[in-house]
Amino acid sequence: TARYFRLVFGPGTFGLGGMSAPENGLDMSALAGLGAAMQSSLRLGDFRLSGDARIDRYEAKAGFETEPDYYALSQGVSENAGVDVAKVINLTDKMKPDGSLDWTPPKGSQWRVLRLGHSLLGTTNHPAPPEATGLEVDKFDGAAVRRYMDTYLGMYRGAAGQDMVGKKGVRALLVDSIEVGAANWTPRMVEQFKKLRGYDPTPFMPAITGTIVGSRAQSDQFLYDYRRTLADLMASEHYGVVAEVAKKQGLTVYGEALESFRPSLGDDMSMRKHNNIPMSAMWTHSRQE
C-alpha cells in the first residue's frame, strides 16, 4: 500500500483537441486564443489517491477523451493481475425502481459494488443560428438519427414546399467535419457490442472505470474493442443513416469526417464512404521568416 504520492504539473504544450504540433516556423498565433482559456487554469472536481493497480490512461482508452496515438499509451507499464472475469456479477436485475440495491453478497469474500450510469454531454450543433441550435443527436443510435433527419428535412419541405427538396430547390446535403468531442455510450451499446465483436462486454465493463479485469492485456484488448465498436457505430448509425435518408429523398450527399486530427472517435474512411462526394478541409498558415 502506498504511503506517499506525488502530483507533478509539467509545462503545457501546443494542442487543440488532439491537433498535432505544428511544423517549425509556422505562425499559429491566429489559433492561440482557441486554447488559451483551457491552459490558463485547472479546476479539479474530484481528486482521489489509491494504491490499487489501475488501467493506465483508462479515460482515453474507454472513450471519455480522445488521444492522437493510442499505441503509445501504457508503454513500459508493468503487468498486473486484476479482478477475475468469472467473478464479475451483473446486478442490474437486483436494482429496485427507486435506485436501491436488493442483494446479499456471498459470505467469505470482499465485494466492490460498481454502479454505472450515463448522461448527456450537453454538446450543441455549431455553428448555427439560435433558432436552429439544439442538443446533438446520439450518433451511435441509427433510429434516433433517422428521426432527426426526417424532422430536419421535413421542416425544409414545410417551409419551401413538398416538391422543393430533391430534384429542385434543396438538392444536396453537406455533412460537415465532426467536432462534437468524445462520447462513449448509447442505450443499445451492449447489444451492438455483442453483434460487432462477438462476445458479451458486461463482465469487462468495470474496465471503463479503470479497474483491471483479468489482466492489463485483457483489459486493454477489451477497451480496444470498445473503441472499435464506437467507431463502427459512428460510421454506420450516423454517417450511414444520414446518407440513406438523404439519398431516398433525392439529395446528393457531400461529407467531411475527422479532418487532420481526432476530435471524436471514428474510422475516417469508413465515415466518408457513405458520401456521394467525399470532402475535406485544408488549413494554411503563414511561415515565419
Q: Where do the language-model regions lie?
A:
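Catalytic-domain carbohydrate-binding cleft regions of carbohydrate-active enzymes
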Residues: T66, L73, V77-E289
